[in-house]
C-alpha cells in the first residue's frame, strides 16, 4: 500500500470479487484516514467494532498507514486486520478509520450465516470455504 504511486488508492484483496462498477468509492475517500467497511461478523462475535482490511481506501499516505505497516513488520505472526485493531483503541480508531458502506466489502459469513440481503458491490470470499467458492468459479 505504501508503494502505490497513486494519490487516491483503494486496496482490494485478491479474494474479493468485484460484482459491479465500484469507481464511485473514490468519491467517498478523503485525506487523513483509512476508509474501511465494518467487519459485521467479527464485531458481532467479538463484542467490539472491527474493520475488515479486505478493502482499504486512502488519499496520500495517512500516518496510520505507516504505523500499521510498521506493526505488521514487527509482528508478522498475526493477520494485518488483527494488527491494525491491536494498535488502535476506540478513541484513536475514530481519528484514523472512517466507515465505507457495507456493500463495498460484504463478508462471506454475512451472506452464509447472518442472512445479509443488502447490495453487494464487492463480495469478500473469506476463509477456506471462501477460497473453495473462488476455485469453483474458475
Tell what function each PLM region has:
Residues 43-51, 131-135:
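Short, charged, surface-exposed secondary-structure boundary motifs
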Residues 50-53, 118:
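Short, solvent-exposed loop/turn segments at the edges of secondary structure
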Residues 3, 51, 101-102:
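Alpha-helix initiation/capping motif
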Residues 1-48, 57-58:
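GT-A fold catalytic core of metal-dependent nucleotide-sugar glycosyltransferases
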